[in-house]
Amino acid sequence: MTSFLTAARTEQESISYDMQRLRLFSGTSNPALAREIAAYLGVPDGPRICKRFADGELYVQIQESIRGCDVFLIQPTCAPVNDNLMELLIMVDACQRASARQITAVVPYYGYARADRKTAGRESITAKLTANLLVKSGVNRVLAMDLHSAQIQGYFDIPCDHIYGSPVLVDYLAAQELNEVVVVSPDVGGVARARAFAKQMRDAPLAIIDKRRSGHNVAESLTVIGDVAGKTAILIDDMIDTGGTICSGARLLRQQGAKRVIACASHAVFSPPACERLSEEGLFEQVLVTNSIPIAAERHFPQLQVLSVANMLGEAIWRIHEESSVSSMFRG
């Protein structure tokens, strides 16, 4: 499997392509990630104006010609989710009206993903609604990372490339030469994700926390299925929101004799009081997340390690532009 911790594409790997036809533009939700992606590809983060009027309306202008170009718009729809989603839709519309040949929405974090099905009467399936909005706005393709559930990929009536942040997390953990590792799913719904992660961790054993949720953002851990005593437990999830699920799981693992606990997640949503919970002394040895969502400096804590997925996203963008395989990035 390709390592995505290298600085940039090497000269030997950089197959010649039409630089004038590949254009990157970032919204305002994560410009730092966009700059890293641009550096990996060796192309500029294109000039644009994104601003807000006094009444709260958003304005976007692309400040160079993109007629006939292959345009990639980098915008995770994290908090403030409604503003960032609307900004992305306006960017797409601006590019479409500027005669871009193809528009790809690069959405490292896909907001509203947890509303992927009806769990009660008269609810909206907002993950599908968001997909519809992107398609209707004029997007030709979506590049997303670690969607909350795999079926969301099928909500799009256009191509959707779904990539995973796990290789970046696995590369980091492999460099630490951990012994006696067990990969733990914080709930039954995450078993497939944890099993895939365990396979990448040299077929590490798997454990599951059986949990019942009593309300939104409230979770109760009941029992551990599997042996964690004396081992390094790696708790893996797609996102950490308030931290309730993963922290209650970590406490249970400690009670069951885990030597140390490491939390891994692609998306650091970190809604309050997540940072206070995650930084609790003696709970986690490390909390590993990616930079799919920007994390303000005041929300950092000693156990936190933020790993960049810029190279991986940049590689996927390059392959889409070159019409080569994206899925092969994650084979072998």
From Swiss-Prot:
Binding site for Mg(2+) 1: 148
Keyword field: ATP-binding, Cytoplasm, Kinase, Magnesium, Metal-binding, Nucleotide biosynthesis, Nucleotide-binding, Transferase
Uppermost EC category: transferase
Keyword Metal-binding among UniProt keywords: yes
Subunit description: Homohexamer.
Similarity field: Belongs to the ribose-phosphate pyrophosphokinase family. Class I subfamily.
Protein name, UniProt field: Ribose-phosphate pyrophosphokinase
Organism, as annotated: Prochlorococcus marinus (strain MIT 9313)
Encoding gene (name): prs
